[in-house]
Amino acid sequence: MRTITTPVELKVLMNHIYELHKGVRHMVLFTCNKKYSELAIQRLESQGIPYLLQPAGQQNLNVYFGRRECLEAIRLIVTRPLNQLTPEEDFILGAMLGYDLCAQCERYCKRKKGKCGCGGTCDGHCINKN
């Protein structure tokens, strides 16, 4: 008898879908190896869950899924790779994904202050600003 094992990535996806159905989340960002993308898409489509796809490097794929109104906002905000988002776009995305709000605020301030190259000591009035 042969046992079929479910890859960890797909177990994570199934947990996200469960949380979405229970109302724990309104939107999810699921990153997986592209080799699992077809299975992930089949699972989402079979349950009628709307989704968006975004390449994430050579091997990975970002799959956003959840409430349609959230995905419409994501479609407008996330128009380039995640590492190229502005501090404001990054903050909005994190808040929409339900990340800890205080941690998002700290991340935003750190990214915003770090833009001038002084390490955040200038309080936004750095003479080194580009």
Q: What function would you assign to each model-found segment?
A:
Residues 1-130:
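Domain-length accessory/inserted modules outside core catalytic folds
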